[in-house]
Amino acid sequence: MRHFLTLKDFNKEELLEMIALAQKIKAQTKQKQFVPYLERQTLGMIFEKSSTRTRVSFETGIYQLGGIGLFLSANDIQLGRGEPMKDTSRVISRMVDMVMIRTFEQSKLEEFAAYSKVPVINGLTDSYHPVQLMTDYLTMIEFGKADDPICAYVGDGNNMTHSWLMLAAKLGFELRVATPKGYECDPDIVADAMEIAKESGAKITFGNDPKEAVKGCDVVTTDTWVSMGQEDEKEIRLKAFEGYMVDEAMMSLAKSDAIFLHCLPAYRGYEVSEETFEKHAEVIFTEAENRLHAQKGIMVWLDQHC
């Protein structure tokens, strides 16, 4: 049985198999062909962090695959009242066919998976957001930016950055990361990614100059400067990230046909300008839709590898 906790757990071929499934299922969906790959299966969806895209995409996705989604907030189950994660896992995994968890600590997700009898999917943790990176790569393919791309991540060294590191390392493309001093990536995750990159041939570089990172890139991406749970740091962060807003001046340094990706929600006037966001809106909202299709590919792949 396999879980989907971080991209680190898969080889290149397996990740591309999931992407291929996502492409196939998306094409079928567009033709109104809803193939019941997961007929009568139940997806338990545990949310300790709220979300728009994660809930809608997983709940819609499992339904389109012939199953049903069961939404469980921390307040709906005993987990929110102190039941140990391992006990919650041993109960829920006896009643459903797959579990998606959106939570804070990666360790909680891993504990749940360790005791689960069914596949577990990382819907987001403070350390990683792997379903989003599968989504982003699917979007890159659709917009012709997946053939030996040069990608730049500009902003906070957070769960999105960590997942970009793993995707680049596994697939072997070039990634440039620019973060303000003091907001760099987790050094342990960086070490893991760099070790993997030695085998794949990926070129991963780090710096504190966003303009230098973006030069000649095919793909530019960023994320919010203030993630959930960091609201008390907002003013300090806004000052630290001055000069990191992706605007037309910054995008002009990338290739003329470069695309801009954002996992949403976007805060215009902070990490991205209104003009740049709207100029790349078709890509961004295709990316948002692709959460649905990428996650269906992941769920079907996991079911096939139980």
UniProtKB/Swiss-Prot annotation:
A single BP term in Gene Ontology: arginine biosynthetic process via ornithine
EC category name: transferase
Pfam families xref list: OTCace (PF00185), OTCace_N (PF02729)
One Gene Ontology molecular-function label: ornithine carbamoyltransferase activity
Organism: Sulfurovum sp. (strain NBC37-1)
Primary location: cytoplasm
Catalyzed chemical reaction(s): carbamoyl phosphate + L-ornithine = L-citrulline + phosphate + H(+)
Enzyme Commission (EC) number: 2.1.3.3
Protein name: Ornithine carbamoyltransferase
Chain positions recorded as carbamoyl phosphate binding sites: 51-54, 78, 102, 129-132, 263-264, 291
Entry's localization field: Cytoplasm
Keyword check for Transferase: yes
TM region positions: none
Cellular compartments per GO CC: cytoplasm
Gene3D superfamilies named in the record: Aspartate/ornithine carbamoyltransferase (3.40.50.1370)
Similarity annotation: Belongs to the aspartate/ornithine carbamoyltransferase superfamily. OTCase family.
Function: Reversibly catalyzes the transfer of the carbamoyl group from carbamoyl phosphate (CP) to the N(epsilon) atom of ornithine (ORN) to produce L-citrulline.
NCBIfam families (UniProt xref): orni_carb_tr, PRK00779.1
Keyword field: Amino-acid biosynthesis, Arginine biosynthesis, Cytoplasm, Transferase
Pathway in which the depicted protein is active: Amino-acid biosynthesis; L-arginine biosynthesis; L-arginine from L-ornithine and carbamoyl phosphate: step 1/3
Tree of life domain: Bacteria
Binding site for L-ornithine: 159, 223, 227-228
Coiled coil spans: none
